[in-house]
Each structure stands twice: as C-alpha cells, then as structure tokens.
Swiss-Prot record:
Any one GO molecular function term: RNA binding
Keywords for the protein's UniProt record, in alphabetical order: Cytoplasm, RNA-binding
CDD domains attached to this UniProt entry: SmpB (cd09294)
Protein name: SsrA-binding protein
Amino acid sequence: MAKKNAKKSKNSSASIARNKRATFDYKFEEKMEAGLSLMGWEVKSIRMGKVNLSESYVFMRDGEAFLFGCTIAPLNTASTHVVCDPMRSRKLLLKRKELDKLQGLVDRKGYSIVPISMYWQKGAWVKIEIGLGKGKKEHDKRDDTKDREWQIEKARTMKKAVQQ
C-alpha cells in the first residue's frame, strides 16, 4: 500500500501554489529556497491544495524570518483537538548566513522579501521560494507589458512569414 502512495506522489505535480502577483509587482534581484515550520493539520491542508500566497510577505523579527499573510485553510476532518489558525505567521527555515544577508539588504537598501512559490521537495518536504527585490513603479509595469505584447506580435509575424 505504501508503494502505491509513493508512486502517486512522485507522478503528481511538485508545485503547490504560485504567487503570480509577485512577479508583476516586484523585480527580483535574488531568489532562494527556504523550508517552512508547519503543524500537522497544515501539511494535510497543503496536500489538498488549500493554500493562498497572494497577499503574503516575509518579515524579519529577532534575526529570524517569518511568512505572514499566507492562508492555509484547515480541513474539516483535520484536527479536532488543536485550534487551527489559517493566518498564523510561520517560521522560515534558513541558515544564519542567509538570514543575515536578507536582514542587511532589507534594512539598508529598502528591498522586500516576497514568497514566489510553494512546492514539494522529494515528495515529503514543503519548500517555499522567496524573492528579494524592489517594487516596480507604474512605468516599469507598462514597459513590461509593452515588451510582452511586442514579443507576441513578433512571434505572430514570424509564424506568418514561415507559413508563406
């Protein structure tokens, strides 16, 4: 029975959730991977895909990083003896060197730390990809939209030229 479940988890998608808004609102200079400190009911809810990263961010407190604003909806059948708080702040598991680097950049240069995606690593560990970057201004967003539209138009033109 265990072998069936192991095969099923290997074949299933490793991605759990993506923060699509993050790439639109921020220009990332650096990305890194962090572990998450979770409770049992949270892991069960994540396996069922009940995660929302859209309004979440990472903040530093006492030299440690915490994920705030990430909603993990509790399952009805999960835990009856523990009070489930879907919006609690969750500790990120990073090395001291990484934490010091993040703290320095956030304090001095005005960078923000934003979660980009959440995924399974080796089928058992929940990891989160965080990005260190600055917020885009309105004209930066317009430039990105123009570039994207130009790339689409260029691809259409090339496709028509190849077909003729």
